[in-house]
Amino acid sequence: LECQILKKLIVSNANILIACSKETGEIVFGSKTRYHILKNGIDLDSFMYSEKLRTKSREDFNLTDKFVVGTIARFSKVKNYPFLINSFEMVLKNKENAMLLLVGDGEEKEEILAMVKQKGIEKNVIFVGHTNEVTKYLHIMDVFVLPSFTEGLSLVTVEAQVSGLPCVVSTGLPDEILLTDKIQKYPLSDGFSKWANYILESKKYTVRKNNIEVIRKQ
């Protein structure tokens, strides 16, 4: 109730209303309210793909011959980490050399650590914690996965696409996130098994390349 009152006060008193995506604008301001879309800015050159960086980074983590599934997100309920863990568990049953790279911190981290241990897959899951080296970890990954319940405009998903990564994300992300032909959106209602297949199918994208020019034209 307090949130609804606050929304009405903001909409009625603001000179300009700005949202990072159409879907976010409709959620926050309502579909009948006029607002402007201002997409988040990113230094695209910082995420340019480098084969040299990928090789070195994977060697540093002893992941040269591994299939690395990864995400970069805060450990919070909205990011839906349990769904990712359950989906990865099924990936692992089909691909023994699979590894899960989790980059981030947050209030749900201990719960996810316990979940991984309970499933007995801790040898296949790497927790990195907070980092400013996002580019390095995107280069390590073979596929980026984000099963969030909802997102405004996920910057890290844009960054993953710049670096040429295949991306498997939920329909909780807005359509504005679809910037290359290597990203697919799926409903969470498809379940863990189908999501595991979506992740495994991403292996068909065997060639990594920069997508800077493609994304700049968006």
Regions found by a protein language model. Name each.
Residues 166-170:
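Short hydrophobic beta-strand element within catalytic cores of glycosyltransferases
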Residues 113-129:
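Nucleotide-activated donor-binding/catalytic signature segment of Leloir-type glycosyltransferases, i.e.
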Residues 130, 149:
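Aromatic "clamp/platform" in nucleotide-sugar-dependent glycosyltransferases that forms part
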Residues 23, 41:
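Carbohydrate-associated surface elements
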Residues 1-18, 26-29:
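A conserved, positively charged/aromatic
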Residues 67, 71-90, 107-113:
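A conserved mid-protein helix/loop that constitutes part of the nucleotide-sugar donor-binding site
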Residues 48-62, 204-205:
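A short helix/loop element that forms part of the nucleotide-sugar donor recognition site in Leloir-type
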